[in-house]
């Protein structure tokens, strides 16, 4: 995708090694992530980005907690091939374990410089951050980029009926 290559080239000129750590994710992979979190096998965060004991929650509350950070299988923007999560590899200390949590992208965080650069530049290349602010659903994800021209087409096609069918036909 040429817009992504150009975004990476311009980031490199600013000393940033913009690297997608997560891109396309099919339904099966998203379901595996979702189910592992639901079963307490993967970390679950509260709305403040702090670890949460998901197994201590009743199913409806657990689902709500998961939806703050993880899309329902079938509804993930990662399914479209237009969205990805990015880090700055140049900013990584040796041995650092990337978490993709807000603290990494906030002032003082390992990827704060990347977040600022993206704030100033991402739209020039046709990208945007679909989870830039808290609108009461998915929590802000400074690391999540979406290619607007392609994602807008996919979003228009994602109707409740399409999502219901995807879930109903899944194992």
What are these regions (language model features)?
Residues 1-171:
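Cell-envelope/glycan interface and biosynthesis
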